[in-house]
């Protein structure tokens, strides 16, 4: 039985090659787990997740090994892309499409069979019913985020990559998302970034801290780590 969803070794990412933004990074996402990535704004969280999401040209990164579901891969292979789906904290793609067109397009790409019950549960849970035919570019930040979150949890790929998933969501949507995150471990794994320590503690099994492009596993119990962080803040 495979125990690893994603295993990355020796990842470096740069915008200018002499100034790496992500530095010699190793990352493990076990199967059926939620892994957190916490750091201040500008620490490199989004850059790391963009690399893992096939955004960067191969000339902008170097990596020793990439393994997903026990198979060697690279970020740009169709197999790797088919096993992941990313929700970025800001997404300016498909702005002239509405949810229905975007959703149907992505489902065809992922060869996802129709499940109307699941789709309606997600739309209702995020209170998105009245925005299904609104252009994505016309939506508020929170509702725009819901387009991609609904799609993510409908597709159910082995690995969801979520960049600051709670940003822009109201209280009800936030609580609904917490429930989805905890349930998802039955389906697959999640790697999520946050600058909010409470969200990491609430849903994550393990976590990494990132600072100045360096990734470090948090070895202690996450609740103990959270209390230590609060004590240091005074």
Task: Name each model feature, range by range.
Residues 1-24, 60:
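A short, flexible loop at the N-terminus of ABC-type nucleotide-binding domains that lies
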Residues 38-40:
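The feature captures the beta-strand-to-loop junction immediately N-terminal to the Walker
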Residues 53:
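Helix-to-loop junction immediately C-terminal to a conserved catalytic motif
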Residues 61-80:
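Conserved ABC transporter NBD signature motif
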Residues 90, 95-110:
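Q-loop/switch helix immediately C-terminal to the Walker
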Residues 104, 114-131:
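Conserved ABC ATPase "signature" region
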Residues 160-164:
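Catalytic Walker B motif of ABC-type/P-loop ATPase nucleotide-binding domains
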């Amino acid at each position: 039985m495979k125990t690893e969803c994603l295993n990355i070794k020796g990842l470096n990412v740069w915008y200018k090659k002499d100034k790496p933004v992500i530095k010699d990074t190793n990352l493990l996402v076990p199967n059926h787990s939620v892994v957190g990535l916490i750091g201040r704004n500008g620490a490199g969280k989004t850059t790391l997740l963009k690399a893992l999401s096939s955004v960067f040209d191969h000339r902008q990164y170097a990596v020793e090994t990439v393994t997903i579901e026990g198979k060697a891969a690279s970020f740009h292979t169709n197999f790797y892309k088919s096993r992941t789906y990313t929700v970025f904290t800001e997404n300016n793609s498909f702005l002239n499409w509405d949810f229905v067109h975007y959703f149907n397009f992505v489902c065809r790409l992922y060869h996802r069979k129709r499940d109307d019950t699941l789709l309606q549960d997600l739309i209702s849970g995020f209170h998105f019913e009245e925005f299904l035919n609104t252009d994505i570019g016309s939506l508020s930040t929170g509702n725009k985020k819901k387009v991609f979150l609904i799609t993510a949890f409908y597709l159910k790929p082995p690995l969801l990559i979520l960049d600051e998933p709670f940003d822009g969501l109201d209280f009800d949507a936030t609580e609904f998302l917490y429930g989805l995150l905890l349930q998802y471990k039955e389906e697959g794994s999640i790697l999520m970034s946050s600058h909010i320590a409470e969200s990491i503690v609430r849903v994550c099994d393990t976590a990494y801290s990132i600072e100045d492009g360096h990734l470090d596993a948090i070895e202690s119990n996450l609740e103990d780590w959270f209390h230590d962080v609060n004590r240091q803040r005074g």
